[in-house]
């Protein structure tokens, strides 16, 4: 009977911790919109989807189907043509998995350098796909600034996500 109560307690604690982590991720995305009236679609706002997908892909394993469906969801939210973000994220994931044989991505410095190239690849490939489809393009300088804000904000987001994730790993299992 005591083991059953402990198991129920652990399962409920795990659900609560996962909920708080999802709420934390949501607040990270929502905070700039409420505080500074900066929309997620704004070009000075960092590409949070790239940060979150890379974070969970590199430190924890995301499979290719979840990345594909996340890309479809991001397409629906951002108004991009269906499949654009999915193609970009799946391509970047394949390149990351093939190249990760040659380096250890758990090291912080290597992880950051790889993220810089990952971010540049995704933003440039997305820009290329948008210009091929003759959609509205505002210029390459905006993509450059968005990549800079994304790269600079990766460290902050990783600091925010790492300490709760360590806590969740310790108590959720």
Curated annotation (Swiss-Prot):
GO terms for cellular component: plasma membrane. It comes from the Bacteria. The chain crosses the membrane at residues 13-35, 50-72, 107-129, 139-161. It is found in: Cell membrane. It is a multi-pass membrane protein. Keywords: Cell membrane, Membrane, Transmembrane, Transmembrane helix. The keyword Protease does not apply. This is Uncharacterized protein RP566. It comes from Rickettsia prowazekii (strain Madrid E). The lineage of its organism: Bacteria, Pseudomonadati, Pseudomonadota, Alphaproteobacteria, Rickettsiales.
């Amino acid at each position: 009977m005591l083991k059953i109560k402990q198991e129920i307690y652990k399962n409920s604690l795990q659900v609560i911790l996962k909920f708080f982590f999802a709420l934390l991720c949501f607040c990270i995305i929502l905070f700039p919109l409420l505080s500074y009236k900066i929309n997620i679609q704004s070009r000075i706002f960092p590409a949070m989807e790239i940060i979150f997908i890379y974070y969970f892909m590199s430190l924890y394993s995301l499979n290719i189907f979840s990345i594909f469906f996340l890309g479809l969801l991001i397409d629906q939210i951002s108004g991009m043509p269906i499949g654009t973000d999915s193609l970009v994220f799946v391509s970047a994931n394949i390149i990351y998995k093939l190249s990760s044989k040659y380096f250890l991505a758990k090291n912080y410095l290597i992880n950051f350098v790889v993220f810089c190239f990952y971010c540049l690849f995704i933003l440039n490939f997305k820009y290329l796909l948008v210009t091929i489809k003759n959609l509205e393009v505002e210029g390459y300088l905006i993509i450059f600034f968005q990549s800079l804000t994304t790269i600079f904000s990766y460290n902050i987001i990783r600091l925010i996500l790492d300490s709760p994730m360590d806590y969740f790993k310790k108590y959720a299992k």
